[in-house]
Amino acid sequence: MLHTWIRTLGALLLLASVAHAQFQFFEHMFGGGRQEHQQQAAQNEPSDSSRYQNMWESAQCDKYLCPGTLACVHFPHHCPCAHPDNEDKIELSEGSAVCISKGGFQPGEAARKIELARKGVL
């Protein structure tokens, strides 16, 4: 009887230690709980626009300062796209242009879709 009780107790201790090790593994794997989430949140930039306003005010430009990229150009439609690898610049009319997502389209496809929309076909 004592032998059975000792075996049962040993099995329970083994099971408890395996379960504890398993939970420690998952806790470590997923960032260690709340402390990691607090650390990650501290890395985010605030949603305050003062940083952008400071950059705008300190920019040196005697022509036109593009609001999206802070590039200094002669005319507003000369402003570059903020993400040229992912956007195509399309001139809509004299003096106006937009940057539109390429969205995985073939080269020139975004401009064609804008033209179709302008004609009322799309």
Swiss-Prot record:
Answer whether the UniProt record assigns the keyword Cell inner membrane to this protein: no
Task: Report which superkingdom the organism of origin falls in.
Answer: Eukaryota
Q: Where is the signal peptide?
A: 1-21
Q: What UniProt keywords apply to this chain's record, in alphabetical order?
A: Signal
User: Is Signal a UniProt keyword of this protein?
Assistant: yes
A GO BP entry is: ERAD pathway
Biological role stated in the UniProt entry: Probable component of the endoplasmic reticulum-associated degradation (ERAD) pathway.
What family is it from? Belongs to the LCL2 family.
Report the protein name in the record. Answer: Long chronological lifespan protein 2
Can you name the source organism? Answer: Aspergillus oryzae (strain ATCC 42149 / RIB 40) (Yellow koji mold)
